[in-house]
Each structure stands twice: as C-alpha cells, then as structure tokens.
C-alpha cells in the first residue's frame, strides 16, 4: 500500500458482523462514526490543538460495503481559514477475495480549532504539493460560499414553494400520511461516547440519528431501507458525558425512489431533564432508497401533508432537494466519459432520426418533479442514476410554426440565450439538419467552452401538432478541439413546440445534462441563481417580438 501523503490520515477497518445490518451490509451509522473520527484526526494533525465538528456537507453513498470487506478512509485538510478548516474525506471498499476496490463516498466536513484557555487561534495555511491539491484548495472557497449562503437560499426557496402548491397537491391520489413514521429514542451519553476533549463524539450522534431515521423510513415502505445520502448539516451546540439525548425522526417527503427523513436532537442535563427543558443541538435530513426481493428500487407512495407542521416539513424537503441538486455539482467533481458520436455523412439519415427519437424519449420519461414556477415558466427536473435532466416549459404568445422557425435557426440563439456567445453553421447537411459550432462564455475564471452539434428539426406529422428541434454533440474531424476552448458536450437536448391555437403555443426545452454543461445550471438548480428563468423569459420575449430581418420569410 502506498504511504499516506503529508497531512493525510488513513483509517483501515475490516468489516465485522458487529458493524453490519441484518442484510450483512456495513451500517451507515458505523461508517459515519469512522468518517468523523478520521476527519477529526486530520484536522488536529494540521491545527496542533483539539478540534470539533462544525458542519458536514452532503454525503453521497455510491457503493455498499459488506461483512468481510475492508474499508479505507483517507482524510486531509484542503484549506484552512482563520479558525476553521475544510477536510476532504475519501472512502474506498476493497473485496479481499478479488482485490477489487470501489469508491464508496467523497465527502467534505468543516472543523473548528478549540483554543486552550483564552488563547487565540490562527491556523497556518495548507501546503499545496500537487496539482490536485491546488484544485481542491480553489474549490474549497466555492464550497464555503455555498455553505454560508445555505440558510438564505433555503428561506428564499421556502417563500417560493407556496406558489406551486396547487401543482403538487392536485395529483396526490393514493397519497399517504406520515404520522405512522414518527420515531423517538433516547440515549445516555457515557464516557465511551465522548471524544478525547469531553464533548459527545459528533460521529456517535450521527450514528444514533441514522438508526432512528432508518426505523422511520422502514415504517413507510415496510422493507429494508438503505442510506443514499445525508444532507448538509451543522452542529448547533455541544453535549457532554451525562447528557440525555432525545432523537425524534419522521418522514418529510418522498421523491419517486427516495424518501427524506428529518431527525431532531435535543440534549438535557439532569436539571433540564427534570424540568423538560432541552437544548436543540442538531437537525439532520437523511435520504433513503429501498429495494424489493429482486434488488429493484421501490417507488415510495406520495405524501399527503395534513397539519401545518406537515406542510412545513413537506415544503422544506422540496427546497432541500433543489439545493442538494445544485450543490451536488459544486461539491463533487466527477469526470465523465464523452458520449459523442462520430459524424458520418453516409449515416446522416439514421443519425438525424436517432437525434429526434432521443429527445422524444427524454420528454416521455416519467418522474419529472416541479422545482420552480413563475408566470409563464415552469421548471422540472429528473434524476436517474445520478444523471440530471431539466425541462423548462414556456407559454408563448406566438404561433407554433413561427416559434419553430425561430428556434431551429441556431445562429439566432445568441440573441436571447446568454449561454451562447456565438453559433456558426459548419454544414447544411439537408433542409432539416445542420451542423453548428457553438462558443460559450467564460465560467469560474476557466477557459470558455465550445461545442460541435447536430441540430435536427421536424414538422408535425399530419395528425400531430408538435414541432421538434433536437440537438446533440458530434465529433467532426474538420473542427478539432482548440486549445483556446474546453470542448464540451450536449448529450441530448432540444425543443418540443406544441400549438395551443393559431396564436399561441407551449415551448418545452429539454436537456439531459453532461458534466461539462452542468456548471452553467448548478446555481439555478440549487436556488441561488435565476439564470434558467431569466433565459426562458428572454426566449419568450424573442419569440413574441422576433427580429425583423427577413429571416422568417426566407428560412
């Protein structure tokens, strides 16, 4: 095994039956304890003083570990601020029979240094040795920005959520109440539960929270739920040996194959216990999946809120899901394998038809969730196997045939879409298929991105009234990647234009997101930007007041 890098702390654990659930899988609570321990020791290695967990970013679990396998956790400080540090944590699992290693999770937490007495702490900067160290150091500032604006973003989304309650509750046939999912449990903090400086161990609190949350989720599906992710949370206050910790859990909402469970933790010393006066020290939100006997994911029933508190928790889960969606692509940094196809003029007809069919299949998928609505615009998202798709629906006061002509000419796209700097025709393949080279604006001080795409348009069939404009990236030898740009990819995108009457239509824009395109949308999806709504409004304005340059009559 390679030696740990300077500043890195490594924990290796053989998974024993005592660490596992009834299914023989590593308990998520046990893993959270190990993660927190390793992160704390990495923080203290850098700070040289005792440290406590301040907050934990979203934790996504990509793989399940089982009895007999070995878990390896690596933690190191990515960036030190004045008194706090960001710790990156990487968790791997190895099968001892095959030697195969798989990624379980990449997570980030924040630790605060505890000064001795009244001494002020000013942490030394992190020594950056590799290119990856520099990347993580820069991303740490972005992640910190997201953490600091989390509360304001959440409150703004909660205010917005009431605008589309009708859209949500109109379709609640077969919905269920969450009252039967309420769970309460109590723990007495003993010396083995405390860390080496007297406070209740943060990882132990997380493990106890996970236990009650799992029970709550199981009462909704009557199956064995497994933890998929933990929402970002911060520790509100400390507890110590002798405290009684009361954990209360309840299902907040469901999203197709996911269920969110909220857990509240209150701490009581002896006097507070007698008086019934607790301290709220933590709230966390855990997201579960559940599988049937054939290991297929179960679709959870929709939730029907009844009380005022039910509605608050229901809306809160929707807001958190939206924030989580955007934050996921800031906090994680996944590379992807390009899916572009090579353009072959001899296969032009089949490539164009598959382009159109892919868009129609994306539009027909089930499980789209409303995330935003404003005046003439609705935004939906769909997550499948950690791949995100977006659907933007616009009501336009313009004939469908005119909208089709305007939107199918991509040279006009920069007039209304700020994500397009330029769009030039490479080749007119046919009357209904064109190849374009697109350039995009600079984002996050990086080089600008560019794209080579096939745009295929189709008029409605005789018995239909929907126009189609489909887009996907292709590889074209005549336009190779340029060092001036980062070559990016559109997997599947485009417009479906549905006529309402002779003077109005619904324009639906779909995009099956690639990692290279996501940064332009992450802020909007996360709730701290309005770029999608602003672009949609600009599109409506463009379609209702088209440029008078002879384009409409000649195209």
Curated annotation (Swiss-Prot):
Stated role: Catalyzes the hydrolysis of acyl-CoAs into free fatty acids and coenzyme A (CoASH), regulating their respective intracellular levels. Preferentially hydrolyzes acetyl-CoA.
PANTHER family the UniProt entry points to: ACETYL-COENZYME A THIOESTERASE (PTHR11049:SF3), ACYL COENZYME A THIOESTER HYDROLASE (PTHR11049)
Effect of residue 190 to H: Found in a clear cell renal carcinoma case; somatic mutation
Subunit structure: Homodimer or homotetramer.
One Gene Ontology biological process: acetyl-CoA metabolic process
Name of one Pfam family that matches: START
N6-succinyllysine sites (modified residues): 33, 159, 228
Binding site for CoA: 53-55, 82-84, 144, 234-236
InterPro entries: Cytosol_ACT, HOTDOG_ACOT, HotDog_dom_sf, START-like_dom_sf, START_lipid-bd_dom, Thioestr_dom
Reaction(s) catalysed by this chain's protein: acetyl-CoA + H2O = acetate + CoA + H(+); butanoyl-CoA + H2O = butanoate + CoA + H(+); hexanoyl-CoA + H2O = hexanoate + CoA + H(+)
Species for this entry: Homo sapiens
UniProtKB keywords: Cytoplasm, Fatty acid metabolism, Hydrolase, Lipid metabolism, Repeat, Serine esterase
Ranges of residues in domain START: 340-549
Entry annotated with the keyword Transferase: no
Protein known as: Acetyl-coenzyme A thioesterase
Subcellular location(s) of the protein: Cytoplasm, Cytosol
CDD domains, sorted: BFIT_BACH, START_STARD15-like
């Amino acid at each position: 095994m390679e030696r740990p890098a300077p500043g890195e702390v490594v924990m290796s654990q053989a998974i024993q039956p005592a660490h596992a659930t009834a299914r023989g899988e590593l308990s998520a609570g046990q893993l959270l304890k190990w993660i927190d321990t390793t992160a704390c020791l990495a923080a203290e290695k850098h700070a040289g003083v005792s440290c406590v967990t301040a907050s934990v970013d979203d934790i996504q679990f990509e793989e399940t570990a089982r009895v007999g396998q070995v878990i390896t956790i690596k933690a190191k400080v990515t960036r030190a601020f004045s008194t706090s540090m960001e710790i990156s944590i990487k968790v791997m699992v190895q099968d001892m029979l095959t030697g195969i290693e798989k990624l379980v999770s990449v997570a980030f937490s924040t630790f605060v240094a505890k000064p001795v007495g009244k001494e002020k702490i000013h942490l030394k900067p992190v020594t950056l040795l590799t290119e990856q160290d520099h990347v993580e150091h820069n991303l740490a500032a972005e992640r910190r920005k997201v953490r600091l604006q989390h509360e304001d973003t959440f409150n703004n989304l909660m205010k917005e959520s009431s605008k589309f309650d009708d859209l949500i509750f109109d379709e609640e046939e077969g919905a269920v109440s969450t009252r039967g999912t309420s769970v309460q449990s109590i723990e007495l903090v003993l010396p083995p539960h405390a860390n080496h400086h007297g406070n209740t161990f943060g990882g132990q609190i997380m493990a106890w929270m996970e236990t009650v949350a799992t029970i709550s989720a199981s009462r909704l599906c009557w199956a064995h739920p497994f933890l998929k992710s933990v929402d970002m949370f911060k520790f509100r206050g400390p507890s110590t040996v002798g405290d009684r910790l009361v954990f209360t859990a309840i299902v907040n909402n469901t999203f197709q194959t996911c269920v969110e469970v909220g857990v509240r933790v209150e701490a009581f010393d002896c006097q507070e216990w007698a008086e019934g006066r607790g301290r709220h020290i933590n709230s966390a939100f855990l997201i579960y999946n559940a599988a049937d006997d054939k290991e297929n994911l179960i679709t959870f029933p929709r939730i029907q809120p009844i009380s005022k508190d039910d509605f608050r928790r229901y809306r809160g889960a929707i807001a958190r899901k939206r924030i989580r969606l955007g934050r996921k692509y800031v906090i994680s940094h996944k590379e992807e394998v390009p899916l572009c196809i090579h353009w072959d003029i001899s296969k032009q007809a089949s490539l164009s038809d598959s382009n159109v069919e892919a868009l129609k299949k994306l539009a027909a998928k089930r499980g789209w969730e409303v995330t935003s609505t404003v005046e003439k615009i609705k935004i939906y998202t769909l997550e499948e196997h950690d791949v995100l798709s977006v659907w933007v629906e616009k009501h336009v006061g313009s004939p469908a045939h005119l909208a089709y002509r305007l939107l199918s000419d991509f040279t006009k796209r920069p007039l209304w879409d700020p994500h397009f700097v330029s769009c030039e025709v490479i080749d007119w393949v046919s009357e209904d298929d064109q190849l374009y080279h697109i350039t995009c604006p600079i984002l996050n001080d990086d080089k600008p991105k560019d794209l080579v795409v096939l745009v295929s348009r189709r008029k409605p069939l005789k018995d239909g009234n929907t126009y189609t404009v489909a887009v996907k990236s292709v590889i074209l030898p005549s336009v190779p990647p340029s060092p001036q740009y980062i070559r990016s990819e559109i997997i599947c995108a485009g417009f479906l234009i549905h006529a309402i009457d002779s003077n109005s239509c619904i324009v639906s824009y779909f995009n099956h997101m690639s990692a290279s395109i996501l940064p332009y949308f992450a802020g909007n999806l996360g709730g701290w930007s309005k770029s999608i709504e602003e672009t949609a409004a600009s599109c409506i304005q463009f379609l209702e007041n088209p440029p008078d340059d002879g384009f409409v009559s000649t195209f």
